[in-house]
């Protein structure tokens, strides 16, 4: 099997797509890109304003074209389908909801601080809304970022899909990706 030079890693928020992509990039020299860096306009605080679809696609397309070996983490369902032909391998991470939500809480604390997300904090409402949105992933419909949407999207892909349990250690996941052909 040819070495995958263009890998997309997708899963629910908190499934570990960014961590696995960073591990692949560090070990194999792929450039690591994350869909959030293209989906969202730079704001302070971050993740408040979506970048319009066409400029988002153009920026991501240019970034992918700038490097022959890349790993893209995050979801692009609903806006990034023109990029599907670029993927040599798609890795889908599946993680139980309780583990994902714990990871997300920890990430929010590390990113914003406990005081900011605690009741009365400057980010509390946004934090609660974000976790509520993330908690709906497994039962959500095709109209939102959900397991159902990801499964439908994956089923339509023309290339290989590697499904991994995202509650494994990143090193274990990396070995499984390597067995699938990364050198």
Go through the PLM ranges and name each one.
Residues 9:
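Hydrophobic anchor at the beta1->P-loop junction of P-loop NTPases
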Residues 15:
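ATP-binding Walker
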Residues 22, 26-68:
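Conserved substrate/cofactor phosphate-moiety recognition/catalytic segment
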Residues 53-98:
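Glycine-rich phosphate-binding loop used to anchor ATP phosphates in small-molecule kinases
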Residues 2-4, 132-183:
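NTP-dependent small-molecule kinase module
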Residues 18:
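Walker A/P-loop
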Residues 12:
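P-loop (Walker A) phosphate-binding loop of NTP-binding proteins
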Residues 95-145:
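A glycine- and Lys/Arg-enriched "phosphate-lid" helix/loop adjacent to the NTP-binding pocket
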């Amino acid at each position: 099997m040819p070495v995958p030079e263009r890998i997309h890693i997708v899963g629910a928020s908190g499934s570990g797509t960014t961590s696995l992509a960073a591990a692949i990039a560090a070990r194999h020299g792929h450039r690591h890109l994350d869909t959030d860096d293209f989906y969202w306009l730079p704001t302070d605080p971050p993740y408040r304003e979506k970048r319009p679809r066409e400029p988002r696609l153009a920026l991501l397309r240019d970034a992918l074209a700038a490097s022959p070996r890349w790993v893209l983490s995050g979801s692009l369902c609903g806006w990034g389908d023109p990029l599907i032909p670029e993927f040599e391998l798609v890795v889908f991470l599946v993680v139980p909801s309780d583990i994902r939500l714990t990871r997300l809480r920890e990430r929010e604390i590390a990113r914003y601080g406990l005081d900011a997300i605690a009741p009365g904090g400057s980010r509390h409402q946004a934090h609660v809304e974000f976790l509520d949105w993330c908690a709906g992933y497994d039962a959500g419909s095709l109209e939102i970022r959900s397991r159902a949407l990801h499964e439908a999207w994956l089923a339509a892909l023309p290339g290989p899909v590697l499904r991994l349990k995202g509650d494994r250690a990143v090193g274990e996941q990396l070995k499984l990706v390597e067995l699938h052909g990364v050198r």
